[in-house]
């Protein structure tokens, strides 16, 4: 019973170091406040006067035949060169001494202080002494000094005093030494804080202890929580099975991989796979970010690596997961700060622990990185990271599975097709797809709908890709029409050209830095593309610029095509320099990796001469100009389709693939858009309405083509220039060959 009572008794909390510091600081603050209050309360108000004022006052006292003007005391303070006089006198005399007038004879007592140096005091004393016949009284006979100055023999002085050496009050002592004490306490607190923080770096693994900085976590994730990445899951499942049943593999004489490296773009689920591994394996799982190894102190990173592996060996079988491995695993000797820095020392220790003298049986090392290309080769060799698995972006079926997984527990409208959403999200990572579902859920709550609708999912896709719509931006009808023509040009080329990107959605609502937004996707996902398909894609990109040139002329083309030009140029350059799809032949002039997260070279390998560089530029220009000419031909032959899609954008601001297909098939606006157009007619006059939609009495007017079609001429000139360069190169080679023959 006693034990029970004791167990229920609340334990007294020990006073921490910071609690003591807080109490001491509070006491010091209270003392300072008390001193300030005491100082101001104890201060007496003393009038300040000059030395001549004191002389006049003494003379007035000497001239008076009565005791109405009387010095109660004069205090000499030699330590601050002052005289403090206290006297009684009538109001009118006090006023006269201060240069004022008064008729009152009421007696008052005043105290005033005058500044007087030693020489000034001596003058005053000498005058007083001379007035009593030259006799020099002792200091204790100070009464006679003023008494002798009286002409009528009337007593005019009380005491003449001299202050002793000043004594320091307790408050002055506290104020003088308190600042030093506070400074010392703050210094000690800072030192102890640094010491304690280093001992408990991020909770564990400090300077002086042997605790590992790696966190031992318990995950509730399973492989069933991961959609897609089936091949990766199969690889990891094998490792988990080994940790659960090691005898099965040892009997077969198999050595399980010591390490597995997960690489790939961000958001593809590398860390999620590690969490699922921890949840499935049911063994100790140690998680650490590679950036936690390197700190400001030399040797701390290597120590943390040793501590982490030592703790894992004690609990084997175990899994160690290092996230963002490139923070510590970059190739040695490539740093600007020199080869023997703290990061490289940490990497060396990691290499030793993974495959060194000590055995790591029963320990599986997993790591994730977005930059596997920059890792040290010694880290990637067999025996350390035996397997390198690329966790890539999901394909259309995997995107559908990921969307369904994240949609569990959410109310989705019946007409929503996840396959259609997956088709509209090419290149999306798993994290982006999860964000799409979450954004749609937030829109559903904002719009107060019971279920997540298809328009909300479409808007969520747009928000993830290009940011929220800027609906409040004021755009003139003229600029709005120009944007509509631009986006309609992309759509027309995409519809009519074979192998090009098809438009899935168009909007003229500004998003991000763009005035409009066009979702263009290939008809089907492919890993390889032919030259014709690439040229068709470039032609689709040029459709917007060409449409503007046809309607407004080449001199009035806007800057809205900058992104299209950049994409088209990038594809054309790769066709010439990497893929061998030009007249220069199958030669690789430059090296650039499609996926920057699997290898990005900021300084491209350009191993060619200036003349070859000129030929490359000419080939790129030739491809772009040919695509632009083809886009002009397609749009010129489909001007009415261009106008209809432009009208649909002006009316609805956003149209999707189904509406675009309806317009292309029936050469008229869908019924819903037609009705909106009729309602819109009521807001405009007939003339303004016709000008907006290029109509007269409901019939389309196809304006004059303002595009200057000199592209074919430019292409011909380019071809002639290329041929001239080839002839020049051939003659140069022949001359060098003949010289060599002569020399031989």
From Swiss-Prot:
Residues covered by region (Disordered): 722-744
Compartments in which it is found: Cell membrane
Cofactor descriptive note: Binds 1 zinc ion per subunit.
Similarity remark: In the central section; belongs to the AAA ATPase family.
InterPro entries reported for this sequence: AAA+_ATPase, AAA_lid_3, ATPase_AAA_core, ATPase_AAA_CS, FtsH, P-loop_NTPase, Peptidase_M41, Peptidase_M41-like
Residue spans, topological domain Cytoplasmic: 1-16, 199-744
Protein name as it appears in the record: ATP-dependent zinc metalloprotease FtsH
Cellular component terms (Gene Ontology): plasma membrane
Keywords on record: ATP-binding, Cell membrane, Hydrolase, Membrane, Metal-binding, Metalloprotease, Nucleotide-binding, Protease, Transmembrane, Transmembrane helix, Zinc
Keyword Iron tagged: no
Matches recorded under HAMAP family: FtsH
Documented EC number(s): 3.4.24.-
Organismal lineage: Bacteria, Bacillati, Mycoplasmatota, Mycoplasmoidales, Metamycoplasmataceae
Source organism: Metamycoplasma arthritidis (strain 158L3-1)
Residue ranges crossing the lipid bilayer per the database entry: 17-37, 178-198
Membrane topology of the entry: Multi-pass membrane protein
